[in-house]
Amino acid sequence: MTDIYPQANNNVLVTGACGEIGQALVQELAKRGGHRIVTADIAPLPDAIKDKVAEHILGDLVYKIKIFYDYDFDVIFHLAASLSSKAEVATEEAHRINVEGTMQLLMLAAYRSEKYKKTVKFLFPSSIAAYGMSLPEKKSAGLVKENEYSSPHTMYGCNKLYCEKLGMYYSHYYGQHHLDSHPPVMLDFRALRFPGLISAFTLPSGGTSDYGPEMLHAAAQGKPYACFVREDTKISFMAMPDAIKSLLMLTDVSRKNLSHVVYNVAAFALTAGEFRDRALKSFPDARITFEPNPRRQGIVDSWPEDVDDSLARHDWGWKPDYDVNSFFDNYFLPQIRKRYGKN
């Protein structure tokens, strides 16, 4: 890896760069140009993004944090996380990764913002897991706003909600310096609550919302698939390009246009049964059954069927490029067919 952007205007840190969101974000930042991209992950960089990165920090973020104090980052995209299902198995480890890692990066951004009198932007992908509700509430809630049902049922959701609050604190109230006669420059924290994200170019990683893409990958390969949630289970989803679009739109917008720190974004909502129907339409020989796993079902049942993203639409012009039909017809299915030779 070399310094491919020696005259770059922005120094950018992307943690969790080897994940689905991280790889897509690095590719888009490199495509835009003008960024010197530093990445961090516990895994080596995949070949797809190696030539787009100036430097990669390999290792556990919590233990590597001192290294980052030597860098002059303009923007931090903190994507590294222990996801929902894994976090339920290893709760203490999830808290260490999700909370301690986030807090240490927030402290870094706060320190650099104050010392060098230059605001560091801190972009944080939160999740619909930050919500928590009973199944009857889920069925009756309709479009859920950012300030509703904020009692998450999972460690991952608790971590995300708490980190949203930490971000607000470090942005506005850190050390109560906002009360000083001459307040210091503070970091600029911005968060998105993502729905289930689906990439056409990477394999599902076993996440709690991955039953939809897993179903279609199995159908394309002629493999049977037992879906781990009920047929009527419904949550919101988004194509990965729209996730990256929303993240960069929120990065670019002026702070004066933002009325909130945390924003919902949405694209379309589907039941598991509707995913099955799409799979059968494209792959008529698909063998799909429903065998709910009580724990994973319980997690998804605590998430809203859909969210209200009107704040994002109003404040910074958010609008997804992919609705449900264009997602399947123009984005996801063409790549699935290509991957498995079904053209």
Residue ranges and their predicted role:
Residues 103-155:
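Conserved Rossmann-fold NAD(P)-dependent oxidoreductase catalytic core, especially the SDR/UDP-sugar
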Residues 87-88, 149, 193-206, 214-238:
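A conserved pocket-lining segment of Rossmann-fold NAD(P)-dependent short-chain dehydrogenase/reductase
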Residues 12-32:
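N-terminal Rossmann NAD(P)H-binding glycine-rich loop of SDR-like oxidoreductase domains
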Residues 133-136, 151-189:
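Active-site Tyr-X1-5-Lys
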Residues 223, 228-231, 236-343:
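C-terminal substrate-binding subdomain of Rossmann-fold SDR/epimerase-dehydratase oxidoreductases
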